[in-house]
Amino acid sequence: MSLRDALKTPSSEITDEAVYRDRRRLLQLFALTPALSVAGCAEADPPPPPKTVVTPAQARSGFRTAEELTRLEDVTSYNNFYEFGTDKTDPSKAAKTLKLSPWSVKVSGECEKPGSLSLDELLKGISAEERIYRLRCVEGWSMVIPWTGVPLGEVLKRFAPTSRAKYVAFTTLADPQQMPGVRYRSINWPYREGLRIDEAMHPLTLLATGLYGKPLPQQNGAPLRLVVPWKYGFKSIKSIVEIRFVEKMPETAWHDLQPSEYGFFSNVNPAVDHPRWSQKTERRIAGTASKLFAERIATKPFNGYADQVASLYAGMDLKKWF
């Protein structure tokens, strides 16, 4: 399946179709009225993101939520992607020149069918899906984002992992020529993340190729990133170039840098504070809310996906295995 095919699902399936029709009419209006002043446009409040319609079955699955979406402009301008800088606005400025084609992903380790595949080959034959997920950053802010992608488990199955594959390790591209942040040792590059095999195979775990019905922007992890909605955002590794099936728990970038602050599992848990701040509440960046003064809401265990994933951790001490 080509990326173009992967993103053919109409945007009306992400949000109310009438909203998209109104948006198109608005764009046509602007095109037909050049006399509209730029100053007037700048002064107007941006429209809130569209509301979504969620069926009971979708709500139970966790694949969609009726919560107010975060505006596209906020999703694409407020990012953590240290390969392009440490400020929230750095990635949207510095990542524009990241070359997305050709792009290949190497799959190796404890599997029967390893290989290096192009993006089209990796996703071939797997139907793309729309998922509206909450994203909770370990820093204490959150968003609600409509993603396009494929279930990670469906991709991993085609490599036939063996019984020794207990974990899945992921690696981000680290190219100092394209990624200015890699020239500095703020992190032990390349960026690495990992999941337990059952977490990787869980239906909620998404290999994302787009958001808001469009291909992923570079600053959001193009062309391929993880979205693991019940974990803190740094687990959703971006711009993936390597996947390895391994027997032992892999070392991950933030745990390597500060193991007392960033655990391997990093499930969203309001009962376990970060050593330097509380995790009981979060700033929800949604609608027209200011990023700095967004409403604080209570953080839910597993980011609100406990019904779907809590059983994965039955019997575990979640304060120890944070």
From Swiss-Prot:
Its EC number is 1.8.5.-. It catalyses: L-methionyl-[protein] + a quinone + H2O = L-methionyl-(S)-S-oxide-[protein] + a quinol; L-methionyl-[protein] + a quinone + H2O = L-methionyl-(R)-S-oxide-[protein] + a quinol. Residues 1-59 form the signal peptide. Keywords: Metal-binding, Molybdenum, Oxidoreductase, Periplasm, Signal. One of its GO terms (cellular component) is periplasmic space. Part of the MsrPQ system that repairs oxidized periplasmic proteins containing methionine sulfoxide residues (Met-O), using respiratory chain electrons. Thus protects these proteins from oxidative-stress damage caused by reactive species of oxygen and chlorine generated by the host defense mechanisms. MsrPQ is essential for the maintenance of envelope integrity under bleach stress, rescuing a wide series of structurally unrelated periplasmic proteins from methionine oxidation. Belongs to the MsrP family. Heterodimer of a catalytic subunit (MsrP) and a heme-binding subunit (MsrQ). PANTHER family: PROTEIN-METHIONINE-SULFOXIDE REDUCTASE (PTHR43032), PROTEIN-METHIONINE-SULFOXIDE REDUCTASE CATALYTIC SUBUNIT MSRP (PTHR43032:SF3). This is Protein-methionine-sulfoxide reductase catalytic subunit MsrP. It comes from Xanthomonas campestris pv. campestris (strain ATCC 33913 / DSM 3586 / NCPPB 528 / LMG 568 / P 25).
